Amino acid sequence: MNWIEYHSIKELPETIWTKIAGDNPCLSADFMEIVENLHPKDSYNYAVLYDNKEVVGVIFYSIFNALSSTLMKLSIGRVLMTGTFETYGKHWWYNTSYISECDFFEMFWQLIRKQNVLAFVIRDFVCNECQMNKFFGLHSFEHIIPYSVSWIKLNDSCMNLDDFLCEMSKKHRNMYKKIIKSRNDQNISFRKEYDIRKNLHKLYPLYINVNKRAKEFKSPPIPSSFFTGLERKFGHNCFCIIMSVGNKDIGFVLIIQGTDIIIPFLMGIDYKYRELHVWHNLTIECVRYAIETRITNIDLGLTNFELKKRLGAKKININMFARFKNNVVNRFCKSFLSKLL
C-alpha cells in the first residue's frame, strides 16, 4: 500500500472525498474549498491510501500555527491536526475489508511523524463512549475531550411547534410559550433571507458582537468572505433567519442545510436588545423551520449546552487524541495539549 497526497480539495477527485463527507454539508468539497480560502497560510493535505489502484483509505489533515506570531515565524508552534476548526467529525475513511483501524492509523503515523511540528492531534471521535485503540496507547497519545456538541433529533410525530414544546419539561415549555407570546407586544418579526451579500453590512457587525463575547469557544472572527463564499457555493441551501424589532435587525442565525439536517452555523446579536431573548427566539425559529420542512436533525454545534438542553438537545463529546512530537515534552507536558486547541 502507498500514500498519494493532494494539497487542495480541488485536486482531489470528489468521489474520494465523498467517502469522508457523506451528506454533511459542512464537510462537503464546496465547504472545504471555502475553509481553505479562509486560511491561506495554513497547509491542507488530503492523503489517499492505495492498494495498487484501489482506494482503501483517505484522511485529511491541516498544519497551522497555534502559538504567538513571534513563535510562528520560527515554526515553533506548528500543529498537525486532522480536520479544521470550522469542521468536526471523522476526517478519515478506510475500507475495513482491506485494513483495520489500528493499521490505518499506523500507516498514517509513518506518513506524518517526521513533520516539523510541535504536536499531533487526531480528531474527532464524536461519541460519549470512546475507546482508545491500541495505536494511540502504543504511541503515547493523550485522550482529551476539549469540546462537546449539541443535537436535536425531531420525532416523526412532531408536526408543529406546539408538538415540539409539549416534549419539554413544564418549566421550559412555559418559558418558551411566554417568549413566543410576547412577540406581538414587542413588535418582533422574523424573515428568511437568501441574499446574504445584500445584508452583510448589517449582519456582519452583529456576528462580531457574538465573537468578541465568546467565552467557551474563543476563536478569531471569520472574515466576511466566508459568508459570500457560502452564498455562492450553497445557493438556497444557505440562508439567514433575521430577527427584527420594527424596522431594525437585532439578530440573525446563519443556516447551512443538508439532505436531512440543518446546521445553525453562527449567530449575530445586538446585545442592546438582550431582554428580548434573541438567542432563544432565533433558535426556536430554527426548530420551526426544521419541522415545517420535515428535517429530522438539528446540529446546534459547540458551546453553552446549559441553554440548549432546555430545548431537549443531547450532548455528545468530541474526543481527540493528541501528543507532542518530542517524547520528553510529551511525557511531562501532556496536560497542556488542550491549550493548543
Residues covered by each model-derived region:
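Short capping/connector residues at structural and topological boundaries
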Residues: 169-173, 312, 326
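A generic structural signal for secondary-structure junctions
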Residues: 22, 312-313, 337
